[in-house]
Amino acid sequence: MLKVLLAEDDRTMVSLLKTFLSMEGFQVITLAGATSDILEIVRRERPAIVLMDIFLGAENGIDVLRKLRQMPDLSKMKVIMSSGMNLRDECLAAGANDFLLKPYMPDDLLKMLKSNS
């Protein structure tokens, strides 16, 4: 069972994604709203993939990604960034493995998760 960590500030989106991914056989860890300790949670949980929104309330997902890439024990972790704004190039330059433009279809997310696992 592939472990996925969802870092998203929209609680409705977290609920929908958690339900969908759980039904598809993924083990899902969620972070909604409280993101200040995201790196600590990633380190503790060791997900196979992090699906992270760019806008995380007080945090910026791209900044979190850059910090993650500087941590030797987490630098190789697979990270898929997502946003309603097309910031694909910025995310890939910061070290993301992939980018999903919102709104996206569930099948697109599944394909991306499987190709990055």
Protein language model regions, located:
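Two-component/phosphorelay signaling modules centered on CheY-like receiver
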Residues: 11-30
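Conserved acidic carboxylate
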Residues: 8, 83
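Alpha4 helix (beta4-alpha4-beta5 surface) of REC/receiver domains from two-component response regulators
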Residues: 18, 63, 84-101, 111
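Active-site residues of response regulator receiver
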Residues: 53
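Acidic, metal-coordinating helix/loop segments flanking the phosphotransfer/catalytic sites
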Residues: 31-49
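Short amphipathic alpha-helix used as the core "switch/output" element in two-component signaling
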Residues: 62-75
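C-terminal output helix
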Residues: 104-114
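The feature encodes the CheY-like receiver
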Residues: 57
